[in-house]
């Protein structure tokens, strides 16, 4: 969970989970079954106090550490979720198991598109990762622009999706972003 604030509004990037500790120690892995451990999410207190100013939630890609907390925390925020078609489908399946079904407004955005989310203009830039449709972002405001990325790798021959394309990132460098 990352936040960007501008002109009285907030933009959330990702809403994931992680695990409290390894599923098993090295010694246990040879002798016992995997142990259960707590799932951990970021503390949403800060943004819960400002939920009326939360313009939207942008999801970078479909891994649990980026979408896993959304079924549990969205009820606090009740704002649109912006992501790609692939991640949206994974998220919809996850939400239907959590009883939210079609209650969450999920807006599908394509690679290279720019979308206004409140005071933020967000551009989706394709990035290589271990699953389809992972993205980095340029977030533009009247105060300036920033580059946001989550997980990525420079991969000329990925197993899924398209090879890494350096061109958009070189253009950002020329724009001093």
Where do the model's predicted regions map?
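His/Asp/Glu-rich metal-coordinating catalytic cores
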Residues: 1-58, 63-177
């Amino acid at each position: 969970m990352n936040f960007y604030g501008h002109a009285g509004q907030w933009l959330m990037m990702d809403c994931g989970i992680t695990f409290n500790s390894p599923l098993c120690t090295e010694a246990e892995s040879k002798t016992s079954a995997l142990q259960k451990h707590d799932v951990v999410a970021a503390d949403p207190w800060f943004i819960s106090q400002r939920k009326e100013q939360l313009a939207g939630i942008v999801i970078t890609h479909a891994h649990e550490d980026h979408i896993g907390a959304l079924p549990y925390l969205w009820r606090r925020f009740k704002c649109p979720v912006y992501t790609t078609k692939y991640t949206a489908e994974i998220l919809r399946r996850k939400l239907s198991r959590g009883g939210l079904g079609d209650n969450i407004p999920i807006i599908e955005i394509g690679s290279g598109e720019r979308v206004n989310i409140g005071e933020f203009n967000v551009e989706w830039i394709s990035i290589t990762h271990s699953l389809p449709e992972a993205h980095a972002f340029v977030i533009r405001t009247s105060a300036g622009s920033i580059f946001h990325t989550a997980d990525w790798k420079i991969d000329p021959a990925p197993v899924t999706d398209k090879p890494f394309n350096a061109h958009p990132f070189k253009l950002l460098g020329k724009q001093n972003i």
